């Protein structure tokens, strides 16, 4: 059995904290670690981290909040901050990021991503 990979917007700083607390109280808990046993403990997809990487050098992006990303990506703000709508919007943002990545990654290669071709350490 492979544990599901959790995905969310600011999942590491918010959602997983709550998941861990609720699992400690109600279960399931990993007997060895005492941590939640619902999701993968290794892999997580924090959409906000991905947004930061894609937008850090864009002067037009003033904030990476969910509200700002809804506006930037043309998503409706109707029902914003409703839990289910936030999940749907997060999924749509992740899908847009993945499609953008796929489109870009077919045109460039990592070894040519640096200005002079050298890798920095």
Please provide the spans of the model-predicted regions.
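Metal-dependent phosphoesterase core characteristic of DEDDh/y 3'-5' exonuclease domains
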Residues: 1-121
